[in-house]
Amino acid sequence: GDVVKKKLHLPMAGGEGDIYILYIDGLCNNEFVSETIIKPLTWEWHDNVSPDLMNLIWEYGAQTADITKEDNFDNAVWAAMKGDTAVFVSGSSEALVVSTKKLPLRGIDESSVESGMRGARDSFNEGFRTSTALIRRRIRDTGLKVEQGVIGRRSRTDYALMYIEDLAEKELLDDIRERISAYEIDAIYDSAMAEHLMEKKWYNPFPVFQSTTRPDKAAAAIADGRVAIVCDNSPEVLLVPATMNTLFQTADDYYNRWPVAVFARIIRYAAAFIAIFLPGIYIALTCFEREMLPDKLLYAIANARSNLSFPIVVEVLIMELLFELLREAGIRLPEKLGNTIGVVG
């Protein structure tokens, strides 16, 4: 399989010892493992070298790598599952973990979900450390804290809370930590799953978390005192708290002059109001408050509906359902076919 286990028998002064190397093929840099771990350990050691193999590897092996000691073998194995290399020595109660990650990741592309006219063009990808680095690159403040942890009993997914220590509210941080510690789940594959699990009221129609794929927007939110939740394997970062105002805010608002940004936000509020209440207003005016409509408009609506056998309420519900079907088809179907469905619809 992809689990690689190597055994090295090392003769030296004062006795002999075995070294076991564990790593995952495809998650680590195989060439780096060979050049910085295996090859140095196969050199001919001199008689004056200490017979303590653990210290021998610590001092002479993998000198160019980030190497740490681990007194818990389970943690060393979990590190190997993430792409590092675990080194075990016979007779030793410690293991060495060498940073050799080379995960299969896509590049940093422009966000296809949150496009904008101005600002940076990069976006998060599925790499955990890449996402935290994109935020750290924009906030070079010593007060920026990164609390890292693991969630999921089997997936062991990395996550991080990113915030500025003197800006984020302590009560908010305590609440987030409490919700995360209450997780009872085998695997977390995306930040969206973490979002659903952290919601206390599943029936609440309003989002408690705001998601973004743009590092500049996440950095601006952190600078405003909010908390960013970064999850491994997810191209989206969660921002808390999420208020109605923040949900109508885009990344362009940070770059445009305030009159332009305010006008654009007013347009968004108006569009949301129309989208939510227009069907109900249409039903109320055509069924119950006809006298509020001009006579010509009322006659036009009556003529248009003269050949329809559905009540107005059913007609509106069918229209809403068709919009949802077209939206779902545009998302799920292949890109070219989805665009065609949208045009025809």
PLM features per residue range, with description:
Residues 1-274, 295:
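Membrane-embedded alpha-helical signal segments
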Residues 229, 242-345:
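Transmembrane alpha-helical segments that form the functional core of multipass membrane systems
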